[in-house]
Amino acid sequence: MSDAYIYDHVRTPRGKGKKDGRLHQATPVWLLRTLFQAMQQRLALDTSLVDDVVLGCVTPVGEQGADIARTAVLDAEWAQTVSGVTHSRFCASGLESVNLAAAKVKSGWEDLVVAGGVESMSRWPMGSDGGAWALDPRVNQKLGFAPQGIGADLIATLEGWGRPDVDAFAQRSHQRAAVARAEARFNRSVVPVRDIAGLMMLDHDETIRPEASLEAMASLKPSFAQMGAMGFDATALRKYTTVERIDHVHHAGNSSGIVDGAALMLVGSQAGGAAAGLKPRARIRAAAVIGSEPTIMLTGPTPACRKALAKAGMSPQDVDLWEINEAFAVVPMKTARDLGLDMDRVNVNGGSIAMGHPLGATGCILLGTLLDELERRDLSTGAATLCVGGGMGIATIIERV
């Protein structure tokens, strides 16, 4: 079986996912076109050597529908022979793309695959695609559906974390992201987005707040208390009977931001990279996905990480750096507690609380950020993990070469 290597990673800046966000006027295919062209240029890549493109998109409707992967390949004027597929594993879609690409390469069926994802949340809001999970009353009742924020607040209640704990984590995310941006740590991977006239739209992550304070966060109202009062708390408490009530601690300041963004990663075999004249940056050592309890929904990273670590023959302490998606503050907090991680090795450049979570792209962004930081610090191994809608987890372990 062939090894799968990472050859390059590019991403857009993340723009505020509202109509006044700097990337709102950029269509999803324009974001991808920007990245495909940048990857081709910086690698002097003969695109006819690429076998396939695998892209994640959580809301594949409107401009993001109809297999945007293939549309973007053609719009970027890559070789006509490069195929494309679009998929969704909810929030994990970007990392799932990388794992699917790695599996294709390891099987020997393909030698170079571009993986990644896109989400324009300002143009196509989360939930625009509907789905039986939330909208079919029979399914809803049978599965015990509750919004993710209810699950996040339930985790905080079960783990004994209050507002000061989750707010402190959120403040640290902004502080670390601000330092990383000031020190140009993201510059290797970030590709500025320009409009059709060549004018700059955005060249940095738009939502980082260096001034984020605990006092300001304390003034924010809980985001999910009203949803809980409408009946979702009762739904969750029917399964979690040791809890008398859910303490609603999450709000806009300690949850992931709604943003626009895209990311790509070139994955290939050693032979495929050599044919393209490229040197590998890292080897994809192991990957795993797993299902978890769907009402609380956000506890999947821990078992997914344990599954991936077992495949790699590693313990959590063998991993130098971790990227744990900050969907809500409690997700990395719980995963780190479960695995016994040193928080100085977790999300060292901030995360989705500070920079946002463009659903289909985030997993790819996390893995690329992880690789850049491993190289900057001259470290060896890293792991990226995300919680996933519907009660799932995903994890990928990489090793520099």
Ranges and model annotations:
Residues 1-17:
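N-terminal amphipathic/basic leader segments beginning at the initiator methionine
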Residues 10-13, 24-25, 29-34, 42, ...:
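N-terminal extracellular/periplasmic Venus flytrap/periplasmic-binding protein-like
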Residues 12, 16-19, 103-159, 229:
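Glycine-rich loop/linker segments at domain edges
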Residues 14-41, 59-62, 85-99, 111, ...:
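Active-site pocket-shaping loop/turn-to-helix segments
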Residues 22-112, 118-134, 190-204, 295-296, ...:
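Conserved beta-ketoacyl condensing-enzyme motif
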Residues 26, 57-111, 142-150, 218-257, ...:
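Conserved catalytic cysteine-centered active-site region
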Residues 87-118, 156-186, 265-271, 336-337, ...:
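Active-site-proximal alpha-helical scaffold in enzymes
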